[in-house]
């Protein structure tokens, strides 16, 4: 709502931090977890949702630059566990994505900070479910009190438990009762952004 009504004015910068835990139990749970060919890496498997958010809110990118790191150095992981990505959006905004699956013990943070000419807003928490700060010209910060559960897989916890809402939308669309929330074109754009980010990865 804040973005669609342009309450922030021109968007100058957006920063997304995703610091998660994916331990040995996760990678040994399946033969595709950790495989460069089958898994693709954390931007496809864990953090595509956040790139989707960036695309949904701010549109396409002109270019991306990135650095990748392997802090855990696990022999069963064929790609990075962490990275820093700079995005140049077509609307001239600058984006930064910091991500890691090498966080100790549990998911630590999923946040987005948006800096605009008329204000700033930060949404965060473990599952990007809390307004941490909102300072916008002539605007009162909304209250969000919803508690969001996570997907618990036993040996590790996943993202926020929202998959049921997407599945329900698919069912309702097939029954001709609702409009689709998203389409494959949007999904392809997100894949292209990730491929652009990964183009510098060996």
Where are these regions (language model features)?
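Active-site rim elements
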Residues: 40-41, 153-158, 176-180
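C-terminal helix-rich "cap/oligomerization" subdomain common to oxidoreductases
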Residues: 90, 165-202
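Residue-level signal for the nucleotide or nucleotide-sugar donor/cofactor binding architecture
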Residues: 45, 109, 182
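Short beta-strand scaffold segments in enzyme catalytic cores
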Residues: 85-87
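NAD(P)-dinucleotide binding in Rossmann-like oxidoreductases
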Residues: 74-79, 91-165
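Predominantly a Rossmann-like dinucleotide-binding segment in NAD(P)-dependent oxidoreductases
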Residues: 1-76
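Hydrophobic alpha-helical segments typical of transmembrane helices
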Residues: 49-53, 162, 166-170
């Amino acid at each position: 709502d804040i973005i669609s009504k342009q309450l922030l004015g021109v968007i100058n910068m957006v920063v997304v931090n995703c610091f998660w835990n994916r331990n040995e139990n996760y990678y040994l749970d399946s033969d595709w977890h950790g495989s460069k060919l089958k898994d693709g890496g954390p931007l496809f498997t864990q953090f595509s949702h956040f790139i989707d958010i960036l695309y949904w809110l701010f549109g396409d990118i002109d270019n991306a630059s990135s650095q990748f790191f392997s802090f855990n150095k696990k022999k069963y992981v064929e790609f990075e566990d962490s990275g820093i990505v700079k995005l140049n959006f077509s609307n001239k905004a600058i984006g930064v994505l910091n991500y890691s699956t090498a966080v100790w013990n549990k998911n630590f943070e999923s946040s987005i900070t948006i800096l605009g000419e008329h204000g700033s807003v930060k949404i965060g928490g473990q599952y990007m479910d809390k307004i941490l700060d909102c300072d916008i010209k002539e605007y009162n910060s909304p209250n969000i009190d919803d508690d969001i559960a996570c997907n618990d897989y036993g040996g590790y916890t996943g993202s926020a438990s929202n998959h049921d809402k997407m599945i329900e939308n698919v069912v309702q669309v097939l029954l001709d009762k609702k409009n689709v929330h998203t389409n494959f074109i949007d999904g392809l754009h997100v894949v292209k952004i990730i491929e652009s980010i990964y183009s510098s990865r060996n």
